[in-house]
Amino acid sequence: MGFLAAPLALYALFVIWPFIQSIYYSFTDWTGLSPEFGMIGFGNYSRMLDDEIFWKSLQHSLTFAVVLPLVTVGLALFFAFMLNVGGRRRKGAAIAGVRGSSFYKIVYFFPQVLSIAIVALLFQFAYNPNSGAINSVLKGVGLDSVQPDWLGDPDLALICVMVVLVWSTVGFFVVLFSAGMASIPRDFYEAALLDGANRFTTFFRITLPLLWDTVQSGWIYMGILALGAESFAVVQIMTVGPSGGGPDYSTIVLPLYVYQKAFRDGQAAYATTIGVALLLVTLAFAAVVMKLGRRERLEF
């Protein structure tokens, strides 16, 4: 255990200790600037439970945690399966990926090369109701009457943000799942096809079971991204208005609300209280996914 002492000490210092400090400060009235503060017990937690904006941000964060992994992982599995197994049969091979699959993987992965801030800015320009690319295309096909204010409409803003997050992350999972599928022996697919199975059947009976551990890890990772920095960056750049968090707080999420309370309003103690709630939500999400996704490990 001696060689683990230094890494464990660093982990405790830079990961565990900040969490402990945050929990401690959540019981105080610290502003974040003054060295003096007093203990107020569960005052911040009582305030949080009565805070309508907190509940709205929690609702949006939970929506992100459920919808984004479902859509992103689902699309990534479909694209990866098509790239590796979905092509037409060729001479000497019972199964094959689509032609040019290596090129498509590069195309799908390209958004990962861009900073999430750049991606958010690009889509902010595209969503512009007056000069954006999306409304310009709608005008070009004769839909002049359909010109939504994408980020200014409370009913559309959250969906627009989620589209950006899916677009920016799906390529990473396509490459991840493609690597996993490439390690599955082709004999399994050939035997299944000889027995009369189609590609739909082989996906659910061969690919998905053998790739399950990777899918589960990807689901948890995407959920953590949706609850953390990725959602904060996109919402902060694309939709923050005078009140913060889009029109009528329609896109406010927990990480952004923590930031606003800590750095805009000078309420660091209350911000750490919301941060504790975010920590509990993240841990609960990971625990639920691991519990629901638990199954016997398949070897090949």
List where the protein language model places each region:
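A structural signal for multi-pass alpha-helical bundles of membrane permease subunits
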Residues: 3-300
